[in-house]
Each structure stands twice: as structure tokens, then as C-alpha cells.
């Protein structure tokens, strides 16, 4: 049996890891898009290094696009197998994948206008919204902690990782000639005290382990301090300066967490009712409806709140924005307000327009609350020192607004939380551990920390590198 690391190898995005059994079955762990690589992204996503027609199963740990985003493209190229995931993951993919296809169509239309002016032929998007909807028939779901038999020799189950609604550590059990091998793939590891979701759960002992390292060299700040910092930023921006606070946020999970937190602030009287809050992202609006459907996956604090407040994602000052004209009106308003909008890395979506219209006004603030990949607008704004100007939609803008970052809202555990998550394993019995989904510096630091905890045979695969699983 072999495993080949196709994506998220010495980088964060593009998760794809191909297992080939001795019986010839091909199982792809996640099928994610590369993101945040500028002009290289499109080429990287088209160079998939595997024949989709030969893949029997895609095991999907969660719905984030850097893990799920190429499923429509693989289907377009001939993949006819099953996509196995939890029910919540399927429901989130049903809105996130078409949204990604829609964005690609719009981006390619803009790109082709430039190509036509240069006398170059038009290019096609990797896939369209229609392509994304067509692949949803391939999805097969299984609830947490229940094994699903893929065939007589292979079964899979998911243990909750607390990273995203429906996210799970995939546990594969593969029988080859009477010998059972268990492979654990963490996907993305969540926080121990998520605002909405249950904490990550232990998982069975594995012979081979594939683990992420997004924040393999970082410790998050305390969440209580982060909440106070958020309150201070809101008060300074919206009350003292009478400006706008733009919060670029991932439409799924992070937006719902921030809305839940603001709901608590308002109910506790920590924020004045007069500050309006807008969630300006159609995808976030749709995702919030799906979150409401899966209240059983919330942690005990949220469940207790629901007993007296049935909607954790609604309060008087909150408006969900779908209409594009209403979104444009937010750019024109001079009223102090909070605008939560996608995308979190500030590379696409309505938030780029809000930033372009707000960044030159010193009364305004931009607050980053999640990971921003290198080369993205978010990463450029967070650079130290702050850049004097940035390019948005091909135009230079002076960076006069205050730029803030709070990393405690991250959906990824820091290295101590990840090590604690792996404490359910006996390191001496794990034959090989593969570190993926991290920048090289984070992976190397995390590897050293694991060694201190008694882990050995740790590998950081290169893109395309293949290993025997004996």
C-alpha cells in the first residue's frame, strides 16, 4: 500500500493525499483547491497529478474549499466514485462548491477581457456553478463515530475535530490479506473551546497518521483577552472615531462565530444597540441557515443559550445582506457600523469592495480574524511595517485605516492544542507520522515539538512524494 502527497505538502492549501491499496483501490483523502498563490493558483489547480477516472473514493474531512474545492473539477474530468463525508459537510458543500464555481466564472470573465485586449484566446474556468451542482449526486454521508464499509476490505468513520460544522478526522481501516492497517487523517484540527462547536474528540490508535500543522509554530492568544480586544476595537472605531469596522471573514464558521459573539455582547449590554451590524455575504447567509439545522452539533454553552434564545445568530441590530444593491449602499453610507463580509483572506467577494471604499479613511478599521495565505491582500495588509499603499482591483489605495489582527478566533488549534489532540495516540506504536497542511517553518517547528513528546518516524512530504505503508 502506498500514499502519495499531491497537495498541502509543505504549504497550507490544496489538500489531496492519494492512497493506493495492494488490491488496486485508489482513495483520495480530500480534494482541495490551492488558494492564495496569485497567478500561479489557476495553473496549480489544473495540474492535478492524478487521473480522476481511476479514483474509487474521495474521503472528505470537511467542506472548506482548500479541502473540497476540486471535487467538481475531478467529476468534470471523469471521477465517478463516491464522496464520503458527514451530513453537515455535504450540506455545506452544496452551497460552497456552487459559490466557488460562480466566483470562478466571474473571475475568468474579467481575466478574459484583459486577454482579449492583448489578442490572446479566452480561457475557461476550472469549473462552473453548474458543474458544481452536478457533482453533488456523488456524495454519500455517514454520521460521526459510525463505520461505513466502502467494500469488503475497506471501512471509514469520522471523529469530530471541532474545526467546522461536520468536520471529522477520517479513520480508514484497510484489510489486505488478513492484515488490518488503520490510517488516521486529522484533516483540520479545531480549538479545544470553540465558541459554537464541541471540542475535538479522541480517535482510535492508528498505524499511520497524517496531521495538519497550520499553526505548528504558534500559540494563540487567550480568548477572553481577544473578546476584550474586539470590544475595544469596536468602541474605538464605531463610537470614538464614528467610522466603519470591516471584518473580512470566512463565510462559513468564522462568520457564525463572530455573529454569536456579538449577539452575546449585545445581550449582556456590552455594546450600544445603535451600532448596526451587517453580514454582507450571500454564502454566509445560506451557511447560517445550515448551522441552524445542526444545533445538535453545538457545544453545551450554545445549547443552554438556545433554551432562552432560540436563535444564536440573530439580534435587533443585525442585518443579513443578500441583495447586491444593498451591499453597494453600505459602501456609500457614512454611518458607523460593523460589516462582516467574505472572503477572509480579502482576495475575493464583496469585502474587497468594502476595503477599497474604506481603506483610505483614517476613521475606519479593518480587522483580520483568520489565516491569510502569502500573496493575498490580507497578508499584505498585515505586513510589518504596514504598507503605505495596496493594489485593489488594479488601483492603488493609501492605507490610512487602522489594521488589526486577532488570531484567537482561528478555527485551527495552535501547536499545544494539536499535540494535546494527538495525546490519544501511543507515539511508540505509530509507524509513520506525516505532517501536512502547513508552511515549512511551521511544519519543522511542530516536528521538533512532537519529538519532545516522544514521537518518532516523522516525515514532512514534498509535493508528489510517495511512501510505502507496510
Description of each model-found segment:
Residues 1-53, 134-198, 325-332, 338, ...:
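Core dinuclear metal-dependent hydrolase active-site scaffold
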Residues 11, 21-81, 85-137, 189-199, ...:
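Pre-active-site segment of Zn-dependent metallo-hydrolases
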Residues 29-31, 55-64, 71, 83-86, ...:
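Active-site neighborhood of phospho(di)ester-bond hydrolases with catalytic His/Asp-centered motifs
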Residues 44, 99-103, 107-111, 225-227, ...:
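Short secondary-structure boundary/capping segments
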Residues 100-164, 295-334:
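Metallo-beta-lactamase
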Residues 169, 190-279, 365-370, 389-455:
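Cap/insert and terminal regions of metallo-dependent hydrolase folds
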Residues 231-376:
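Hard-cation-handling environments
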Residues 351, 433, 458:
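Hydrophobic, well-ordered secondary-structure elements that form the walls
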Amino acid at each position: 500500500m502506498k500514499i502519495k502527497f499531491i497537495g498541502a505538502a509543505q504549504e497550507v492549501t490544496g489538500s489531496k493525499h492519494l492512497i493506493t491499496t495492494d488490491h488496486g483501490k485508489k482513495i483520495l483523502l480530500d480534494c482541495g483547491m490551492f488558494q492564495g498563490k496569485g497567478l500561479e493558483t489557476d495553473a496549480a489547480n489544473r495540474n492535478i497529478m492524478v487521473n480522476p477516472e481511476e479514483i474509487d473514493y474521495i474521503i472528505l474531512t470537511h467542506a472548506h474549499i482548500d479541502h473540497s474545492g476540486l471535487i467538481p473539477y475531478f467529476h468534470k474530468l471523469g471521477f465517478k466514485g463516491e464522496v464520503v463525508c458527514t451530513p453537515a459537510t455535504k450540506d455545506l458543500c452544496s452551497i460552497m462548491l456552487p459559490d466557488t464555481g460562480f466566483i470562478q466564472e466571474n473571475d475568468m470573465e474579467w481575466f478574459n477581457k484583459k486577454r482579449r485586449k492583448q489578442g490572446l484566446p479566452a480561457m475557461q474556468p476550472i469549473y462552473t456553478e453548474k458543474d458544481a451542482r452536478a457533482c453533488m449526486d456523488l456524495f454519500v454521508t455517514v454520521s460521526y463515530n459510525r463505520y461505513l464499509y466502502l467494500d469488503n476490505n475497506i471501512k471509514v468513520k469520522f471523529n469530530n475535530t471541532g474545526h467546522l460544522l461536520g468536520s471529522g478526522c477520517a479513520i480508514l481501516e484497510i484489510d489486505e490479506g488478513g492484515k488490518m492497517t488503520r490510517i488516521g487523517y486529522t484533516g483540520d484540527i479545531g480549538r479545544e473551546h470553540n465558541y459554537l462547536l464541541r471540542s475535538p474528540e479522541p480517535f482510535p490508535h492508528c498505524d499511520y497518521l497524517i496531521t495538519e500543522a497550520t499553526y505548528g509554530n504558534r500559540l494563540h492568544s487567550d480568548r477572553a483577552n481577544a473578546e476584550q480586544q474586539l470590544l475595544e476595537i469596536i468602541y474605538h472605531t464605531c463610537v470614538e472615531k464614528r467610522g466603519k469596522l470591516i471584518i473580512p471573514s470566512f463565510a462559513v464558521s468564522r462568520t457564525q462565530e463572530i455573529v454569536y459573539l456579538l449577539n452575546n455582547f449585545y445581550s449582556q449590554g456590552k455594546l450600544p444597540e445603535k451600532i448596526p451590524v451587517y453580514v454582507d455575504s450571500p454564502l454566509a447567509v445560506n451557511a447560517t441557515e445550515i448551522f441552524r439545522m445542526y444545533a445538535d452539533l453545538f457545544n453545551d454553552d450554545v445549547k443552554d443559550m438556545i433554551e432562552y434564545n432560540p436563535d444564536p445568530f440573530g439580534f435587533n441590530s443585525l442585518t443579513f445582506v443578500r441583495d447586491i444593491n444593498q451591499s453597494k449602499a453600505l459602501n456609500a453610507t457614512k454611518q458607523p457600523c460593523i460589516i462582516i463580509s467574505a472572503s477572509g483572506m480579502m482576495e475575493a467577494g464583496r469585502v474587497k469592495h468594502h476595503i477599497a471604499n474604506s481603506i483610505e479613511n483614517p476613521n475606519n478599521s479593518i480587522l483580520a480574524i483568520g489565516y491569510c495565505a502569502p500573496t493575498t491582500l490580507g497578508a499584505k495588509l498585515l505586513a510589518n511595517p504596514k504598507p503605505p499603499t495596496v493594489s485593489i482591483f488594479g488601483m492603488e489605495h493609501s492605507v490610512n485605516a487602522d489594521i488589526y489582527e486577532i488570531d484567537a478566533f482561528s478555527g485551527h488549534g495552535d501547536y499545544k492544542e494539536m499535540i494535546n489532540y494527538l495525546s490519544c495516540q501511543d507515539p511508540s506504536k505509530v509507524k509513520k507520522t506525516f505532517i501536512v497542511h502547513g508552511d515549512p517553518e511551521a511544519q519543522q517547528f511542530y516536528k521538533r515539538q512532537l519529538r519532545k513528546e516522544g514521537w518518532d518516524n516523522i516525515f514532512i512530504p514534498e509535493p508528489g512524494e510517495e511512501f510505502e505503508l507496510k
